[in-house]
Amino acid sequence: MLLWLFQQLGEDIRAFNVFNYLTLRAVLAALTALTISFIVGPAVIRKLTALKIGQSVRSDGPQTHLVKAGTPTMGGALILVSVAVTTLLWADLSNDYVWLALMTLLGFGVIGWVDDWRKVVEKNSRGLASRWKYFWQSAIGLVVAVYLWQTASLPAHTELIIPFLKQATFGLSAAAFIALTYFVIVGASNAVNLTDGLDGLAILPTVMVASALAIFAYVAGNAVFSKYLGVPFVPGAGELAIFCAAMAGAGLAFLWFNAYPAEVFMGDVGALALGAALGVVAVVVRQEIILFIMCGVFVMETLSVMIQVASFKLTGKRVFRMAPIHHHYELKGWKENQVVVRFWIISMMLVLIGLSSLKLR
């Protein structure tokens, strides 16, 4: 929106042409989303509190969590609005990837909103039935996957890239590409959601990964940089740097309110949406394996749940004291802040490893 305006003004006043630079718009997007969330955040929290949209806490979890009952939830809607408004302001709205990312974010956000609302109304932690949640997630994930396959203009846009190895790629069939895309988007969505169980635990790693993906998107959309760094050139993918920067800015502002002790929780409306958004960006820029590495904390949390469920069903015994694994460490005696900060450190290390793949080939 603003890009179009500045382009029109730039025909007469050359100074406005500076807004054609993707890097400047990415920085402005991050600052815009940050500002919107900071300004609107307190009002949103007050409204959620007034409407008694509070979090239900599991009675079988760590006893220290019982004091969190009633804390406003569904605060992730603030992030989604900030990201959507900012992207519409600063991104090139003629870019299909921008709309794909936005629709994925908002689509998964709607699923999360329904899930959160059911929890509030029924005053329990179950929410939307799992079968319906996965049905709608799958529907959106498959639509995105088929769209990306149908619109791929170059073979490189559907190849699996092996990081840290020079020119190590595998061509994917339609079925393999669609399946991979589906699992990346739906898997990332649920992985972030499972991680969002402690104050600030999920949002800062999300900010870190989004920031890194902004760099990958910028490189992938630049013919010169992509060739130099050995990254698949995806025309138009650079605009996703605006979207990722908006996620990073909005997420950082949300952390202000979500840091321990949290004034508001993100809820499924935020966690499901942000995870799916990370997934779709990674697929577009062909960095699925790098996403897996950078989202190592999310992966660890998900695997802990899968292992716990499988072990209990097969042997009747639990591997962890409680899953997801952040609760296991709480029950071992770690303070909530210790778990959160240590997981943040792990995320930072993994994101740096992911970024190093740009040069280590």
UniProtKB/Swiss-Prot annotation:
Q: Which GO terms describe its biological process?
A: cell division; cell wall organization; peptidoglycan biosynthetic process; regulation of cell shape
Is Transmembrane helix found in the keyword set? yes
GO cellular-component terms in the record? plasma membrane
Instruction: Quote the EC number.
Output: 2.7.8.13
> What membrane topology was assigned to this protein in its record?
Multi-pass membrane protein
Catalyzes what?
A: UDP-N-acetyl-alpha-D-muramoyl-L-alanyl-gamma-D-glutamyl-meso-2,6-diaminopimeloyl-D-alanyl-D-alanine + di-trans,octa-cis-undecaprenyl phosphate = di-trans,octa-cis-undecaprenyl diphospho-N-acetyl-alpha-D-muramoyl-L-alanyl-D-glutamyl-meso-2,6-diaminopimeloyl-D-alanyl-D-alanine + UMP
Cofactors that this protein relies on: Mg(2+)
- Per its UniProt entry, which superkingdom is the organism in? Bacteria
To which pathway does this protein belong? Cell wall biogenesis; peptidoglycan biosynthesis
Question: What is this protein identified as?
Answer: Phospho-N-acetylmuramoyl-pentapeptide-transferase
Provide the species name.
Thiobacillus denitrificans (strain ATCC 25259 / T1)
* GN (gene name): mraY
